[in-house]
Amino acid sequence: MASRTKTGLMETPRSKPSPPPPRLSKLSASKSDSNSASPVPNTRLSLDRSPPTVNSKPTPDRRPSRIPTPEKVHSRLVKGTELQTQLNQIQEDLKKADEQIELLKKDKAKAIDDLKESEKLVEEANEKLKEALAAQKRAEESFEVEKFRAVELEQAGLEAVQKKDVTSKNELESIRSQHALDISALLSTTEELQRVKHELSMTADAKNKALSHAEEATKIAEIHAEKAEILASELGRLKALLGSKEEKEAIEGNEIVSKLKSEIELLRGELEKVSILESSLKEQEGLVEQLKVDLEAAKMAESCTNSSVEEWKNKVHELEKEVEESNRSKSSASESMESVMKQLAELNHVLHETKSDNAAQKEKIELLEKTIEAQRTDLEEYGRQVCIAKEEASKLENLVESIKSELEISQEEKTRALDNEKAATSNIQNLLDQRTELSIELERCKVEEEKSKKDMESLTLALQEASTESSEAKATLLVCQEELKNCESQVDSLKLASKETNEKYEKMLEDARNEIDSLKSTVDSIQNEFENSKAGWEQKELHLMGCVKKSEEENSSSQEEVSRLVNLLKESEEDACARKEEEASLKNNLKVAEGEVKYLQETLGEAKAESMKLKESLLDKEEDLKNVTAEISSLREWEGSVLEKIEELSKVKESLVDKETKLQSITQEAEELKGREAAHMKQIEELSTANASLVDEATKLQSIVQESEDLKEKEAGYLKKIEELSVANESLADNVTDLQSIVQESKDLKEREVAYLKKIEELSVANESLVDKETKLQHIDQEAEELRGREASHLKKIEELSKENENLVDNVANMQNIAEESKDLREREVAYLKKIDELSTANGTLADNVTNLQNISEENKELRERETTLLKKAEELSELNESLVDKASKLQTVVQENEELRERETAYLKKIEELSKLHEILSDQETKLQISNHEKEELKERETAYLKKIEELSKVQEDLLNKENELHGMVVEIEDLRSKDSLAQKKIEELSNFNASLLIKENELQAVVCENEELKSKQVSTLKTIDELSDLKQSLIHKEKELQAAIVENEKLKAEAALSLQRIEELTNLKQTLIDKQNELQGVFHENEELKAKEASSLKKIDELLHLEQSWLEKESEFQRVTQENLELKTQDALAAKKIEELSKLKESLLEKETELKCREAAALEKMEEPSKHGNSELNSIGKDYDLVQFSEVNGASNGDEKTKTDHYQQRSREHMIQESPMEAIDKHLMGERAAIHKVAHRVEGERNVEKESEFKMWDSYKIEKSEVSPERETELDSVEEEVDSKAESSENMDQYSNGFSLTDHTEDSGNLLLKEQHMKKKKPLLRKFGNLLKKKSTSSSSQK
């Protein structure tokens, strides 16, 4: 358009000047008369001022008419005025056209500048977008790389976990092979674990409820803690009162027992007289018949008990052993009865004489029965009071423990819920951070686009085309809003789920309270049953069955609780799935945002294309600019929509941040209750960090479930082993070995626990002293209390050491040691737990062992006292005493051997530990430090859990100690009662006729006692599997019942002592004691055999470890030797480098001398023409040769001095090389002179061969030296070889040169050759002598070194 306007404007002035000539003619015709000649000068001026185009036309009219007429002048004037007007118009038009052109050019320049600026801005925006996209891609790549690394790390952790699982599975297979009969129990445990898994999925729904009730639970816990403190104070007061009463009653009982014993001894003295009597045969036969009847009744009872035992056999395999022992005892009782029958046949002849004495004895017996009945009433009242107090205490303790367990369960569920929430919040925060980054990048793009928009505001005309794009953006906004609403609805659903979980927790608390009430009712029923148990044996059996049923009900209640927990776990898993879905939705939102970004990129590409079109077609710029403005307006609208979306997202973020703050406040409150569950929290935190990768989270959950299953299986195995240990009734020696093993394992845990190990060894020594000091039971009890106190202090020290271990994690320098310790900890975890359980059981069995030992000691005293009274059977008793003394000596020797074996075991175990440490150090150096760090953290978490368990066990041990003290008081009371019995038995001398019936009833009572003990032990073993603490309390109650039963039995013995025969009683007691001693000896021998077998196995292990140690020592020696060789090679390399430098210096000096010699040879050849100067030249050459030899000697001496610092072997090799180098130089010099003198081809070739041989020798020595040099210096030696080769080539060239030179002069100097040869022959031996002297000097210096 601009070109067209220009052409139109330029054509207008050209068309206008064409018509003036006709107009001038007309005017000249009309106005010729009126005008005068006066205005001529003006016309000239105007014509002179006119442009040349106008002046050129009138010139042809002027030339022909030089004398103008007035008409012509007038016409000219008119034409001039017209022309001037036309010219003025044309000039004005031209000015206007120029102004328009300038304006158009300015507009064009402005438009072009605007376009350029817009293009620049668009390009800058595109570049920034590209940069943002590249940054996004980098971030995505880095995110993917981090994901890949995390996946790799998780895979490595999973591999390590799988390895652990493989090892644990191997251990489980070994355990299953040993316990094939326990598969049913394991299957039941696995089913329970599956139920627990199912319930764990439900625990996530209960997390918010647990948080809401956390404060209430804490308040309730504080109230219960206060109540527990009050109850504990009351219990202490009651225990003090009971202790005082028990001590008093024990003193009285001891006095009564001593009296009864004295009376029994007197009766035994009288039984010898009664044995002569035969009158009591008939009564004894009746008693024998009664015994038979009683035996049949006992057999019926045995059948009943066997049926009950068969029912319990399916649950516990170890009870069969106890039944076998009971059967053995019964068989022994039957044997004793047979012996008694034989003795009764012998006593038939004697009993006739004892009839007269029976009447007086009956009167005495009646008096004693009255006294015994009075004592029984007193004892029954006392037992009732004690039982009532203990039952109240047990009730209170059960309440406290149940409350504590409930609180712990609630705390665990809270912690799990909080951890899951933390994981969810962390994922949300990551997504929000990504969104914030995208929003920041979008804002940057917006700022840049706004800059471009400010420049392009003048082009906002086409807004209609952007309406479609704005509608699409609005649709996307609506989609985002819907997604946000969905998120909010999900949050609301989570809140509702939390409310539901809170309600469930409230229901659980109510159930727990109902269970507490039911437990109270059960305790009341137990009291009633205890009162009814005194009626007879049938009531006792019914009571036991009721207890068993109640224990089953408790088991069922515990299983119901487990099922509830499984449901809670299922709910938690469902929550996890919901969170995964939320994360998937968030990822989809991110994908939508990425699509929008791509859409922006496409729109920017379209803008670029349109800007290129604007450049190509300037005429269509308005349309293109309209399109651009339309696109920019659409972008603005889209940006506004994006800003709105970002604002909405920021609001959502703020709401999420508020929720996070609320959650953090709740977590801070809950973290105060997490002190006891640090290990579980760490594991859950690891799971929360792993939530970034959903697939890995599932695998980790599976691994955790597997570990929980393994742990529960291990717990079942541990419980079974505890039952086996309780049935086996391990002796004190086994307890001592267990303590030693615990000490050794604690040494393996850390070398810093030496003080703890020493104190545990002191405990082991104290436990050994229990075996040596069986007679001094009171001292043993005191020492046991001290040892337990020390154990508590040691456990505290273990906690301190565990804290120090946690601080040692920060020390990176000790990573290898940490890895070694982690493996040691892995291998010893299982044994540590086993031995802790064994200690708990062993501490429970110590009281029983002590009571047995007291009974044995008392029986020994009775035997020694009976030895004085027995006159007829003194020989038999003396033999028995001698056998007992021998057995006692054997026992002492066995005990000493046991101590020696234990000491040896400790020494062997120490050696094994040292060897195992060496082996582990050498093997663990190849492992990775990262895996060891992870394993170390896991092991430390487990250590914390185990230390907590140890603390609980220490508390249980303290309770056991207190209860053992109470039992000790009861034992003292029993001893007092026995003393009273002895006094009462002195009065029973007249009751010899009733001895047979008394013996029968005693046997029956013993059988009943054995059966009672068996049933009680069975009950205790079954209750131990349910709850250890409740089992301990019940065992104490059973022991109290046993004591009461023993008191009742003593009373029965006292009542029936009038009907017993003293001699039969002595024989049965002796037999029983002998059988017990034999059993003890057999147990000791078995223990010795086991110790010997262990010693043999330990010796084998020591031998294997010694072989390993020798192999490792050999490897270490080889390693040291290799290191020494490396050091020697390094020193050799250094020396070789030094000597190479020296040789290089020698080479340079020799080359310089060779050049000098060659110059001198040339000068000498030139001077051969002068015969007068021939002698002088030879003398000069000889002197120079001597100078050269002296120089070589000096160099050899200096080299020898420097070689004194190196090894002899290197000195010889290097000196040989150094010695050869000057000799070779001398030989080369001589050969060159010979070549110059002789000038014969075959001699020259021979000399070259000699040179080559010398060079080969030097090369061989150099190769030998190179073989000794380390590979690091081979490159330097190769360079030296190249230099030697170059030297050889230069020497050959010089020889050729000298040969050529000598051949040219052969014709001229043939007469002087003979003289030259003679002089050279004189020189050669001198030079050889100098070389030999140098060799001798070098060898002498080396020999002196």
UniProtKB/Swiss-Prot annotation:
Presequence extent in this chain: 1-79
Major site of localization recorded for this protein: plastid
Keywords: Chloroplast, Coiled coil, Phosphoprotein, Plastid, Transit peptide
Keyword Isomerase found: no
Location in or out of the cell: Plastid, Chloroplast
Region spans: Disordered: 1-76, 319-339, 1194-1221, 1265-1345
Coiled coil stretches, renumbered: 78-147, 252-1162
Basic and acidic residues bias: start-end ranges: 59-74, 319-328, 1200-1218, 1265-1276
Cellular component GO terms, alphabetical: chloroplast; microtubule associated complex
Biased composition (Polar residues): 1291-1304
Record keyword Plastid present: yes
Entries under PANTHER family matching the protein: SYNAPTONEMAL COMPLEX PROTEIN-RELATED, WEB FAMILY PROTEIN
Similarity comment: family membership: Belongs to the WEB family.
Annotated protein name in UniProt: Putative WEB family protein At1g65010, chloroplastic
Phylogenetic classification of the source organism: Eukaryota, Viridiplantae, Streptophyta, Embryophyta, Tracheophyta
